[in-house]
């Protein structure tokens, strides 16, 4: 495993740069302005977050047993746990960054089953306990880059997705892997109300090429900071693909299906000119409405300590994954 390059410090970001305009997409989808947070309110919410650690801590999850392989430990500065668990995109629980932490307590994660089906020789249905018993858990410190041009460094706990897929024995027809979030409108207000959920079509769906899913960096994740995932971070099981933008990291997964054809994905369905299927982190391919050349790293300090830094190709994992895309036009296949 090649060494991951260390993040660099840069200039402080101006307040006006913090608020990304992804909500404009939702307006284009027919969501009324009254249903969305006003820019000033959004700025105030973000500023209140960065004042310091004055928010109540997220409920503690169950402690997990896991190893810490040296290949996945590094000197990257971690984003504090309260920010990882309190600053989220999970539109099933609301559009503002604080909404998931405030509203996701309604999600029932026990019992939980995960179904693996499609182009496999051995379809599987596993409950959450079986998942964590069958596969040894390990902590991996990964960069996380949001398409909104902010980033974190997070100590995820999970196991390589390829281990689960190998258990199901993909057939020669399998070319893609489709993922689906639980559909539970009675528990997820954003699925119940199009204004709360941003007008997206639910359940949330995502997809990868099979070779991407089988890559050793791709993690099926059940914990963070030594404990089981809190609901707002995608409990009880979510996907982490560290070289892709965060919206590829589908949360609260109930179905993994191997397919012959490329599966639909939620944000690509909503705005195909803005959110591609691949969604590889690429500083040379801008979002139509903002640059992807730099990012704001969310670390331990307040707003005056927030660091702006260059975005790295494939989020710093180019040595490990660039070969997956040899010969592919990354501008066209964004």
UniProtKB/Swiss-Prot annotation:
Keywords linked to the UniProt accession: Metal-binding, Molybdenum, Oxidoreductase, Periplasm, Signal
SUPFAM superfamilies for this protein: Oxidoreductase molybdopterin-binding domain
Cofactor note: Binds 1 Mo-molybdopterin (Mo-MPT) cofactor per subunit.
Main localization of the protein described in the UniProt heading: periplasm
MF-aspect GO terms: metal ion binding; molybdopterin cofactor binding; oxidoreductase activity, acting on a sulfur group of donors, quinone or similar compound as acceptor
EC number: 1.8.5.-
GO-annotated cellular components: periplasmic space
Catalytic activity as recorded in UniProt: L-methionyl-[protein] + a quinone + H2O = L-methionyl-(S)-S-oxide-[protein] + a quinol; L-methionyl-[protein] + a quinone + H2O = L-methionyl-(R)-S-oxide-[protein] + a quinol
Needed cofactors: Mo-molybdopterin
Record PTM text: Predicted to be exported by the Tat system. The position of the signal peptide cleavage has not been experimentally proven.
CDD domains given in the database record: YedY_like_Moco (cd02107)
EC class name: oxidoreductase
Record localization: Periplasm
PROSITE patterns: TAT (PS51318)
Signal peptide start and end residues: 1-44
Domain of life: Bacteria
GO biological process: protein repair
Binding site for Mo-molybdopterin: 88, 91-92, 146, 181, 233, 238, 249-251
Record function comment: Part of the MsrPQ system that repairs oxidized periplasmic proteins containing methionine sulfoxide residues (Met-O), using respiratory chain electrons. Thus protects these proteins from oxidative-stress damage caused by reactive species of oxygen and chlorine generated by the host defense mechanisms. MsrPQ is essential for the maintenance of envelope integrity under bleach stress, rescuing a wide series of structurally unrelated periplasmic proteins from methionine oxidation, including the primary periplasmic chaperone SurA and the lipoprotein Pal.
Protein family (similarity comment): Belongs to the MsrP family.
Protein known as: Protein-methionine-sulfoxide reductase catalytic subunit MsrP
Lineage: Bacteria, Pseudomonadati, Pseudomonadota, Gammaproteobacteria, Enterobacterales
Gene name tied to this protein: msrP
């Amino acid at each position: 495993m090649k060494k991951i390059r260390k993040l660099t410090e840069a200039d402080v970001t101006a307040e006006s740069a913090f608020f990304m305009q992804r909500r404009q997409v939702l307006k284009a989808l027919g969501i009324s302005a009254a249903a969305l947070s006003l820019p000033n309110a959004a700025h105030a919410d973000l500023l209140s977050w960065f004042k310091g650690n004055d928010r109540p801590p997220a409920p503690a999850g169950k402690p997990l047993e896991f190893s810490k392989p040296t290949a996945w430990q590094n000197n990257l500065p971690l984003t504090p746990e309260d920010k990882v668990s309190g600053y989220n995109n999970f539109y099933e629980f609301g559009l503002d960054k604080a909404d998931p932490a405030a509203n996701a307590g309604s999600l029932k994660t026990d019992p939980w089953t995960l179904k693996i089906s499609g182009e496999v020789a051995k379809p599987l249905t596993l409950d959450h306990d079986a998942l964590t018993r069958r596969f040894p858990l390990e902590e991996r410190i990964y960069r996380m880059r949001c398409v909104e041009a902010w980033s974190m460094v997070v100590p995820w706990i999970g196991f390589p997705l390829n281990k689960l897929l190998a258990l199901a024995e993909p057939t020669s027809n399998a070319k893609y892997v489709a993922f689906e979030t639980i559909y539970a409108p009675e528990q997820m207000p954003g699925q119940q109300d199009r204004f709360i959920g941003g007008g997206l079509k639910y359940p949330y769906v995502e997809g990868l090429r099979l070779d991407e899913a089988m890559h050793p960096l791709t993690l099926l994740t059940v914990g963070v900071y030594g404990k089981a995932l809190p609901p707002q971070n995608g409990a009880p099981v979510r996907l982490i693909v560290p070289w892709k933008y965060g919206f590829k990291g589908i949360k609260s997964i109930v179905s993994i299906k191997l397919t012959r054809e490329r599966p639909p994905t939620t944000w690509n369905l909503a705005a195909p000119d803005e959110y591609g299927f691949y969604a590889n982190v690429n500083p040379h391919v801008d979002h139509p409405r903002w640059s992807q050349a730099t990012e704001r790293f969310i670390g331990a300090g307040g707003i005056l300590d927030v660091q702006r830094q260059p975005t790295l190709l494939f989020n710093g994992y180019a040595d490990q994954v660039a070969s997956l895309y040899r010969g592919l036009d990354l501008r066209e296949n964004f």
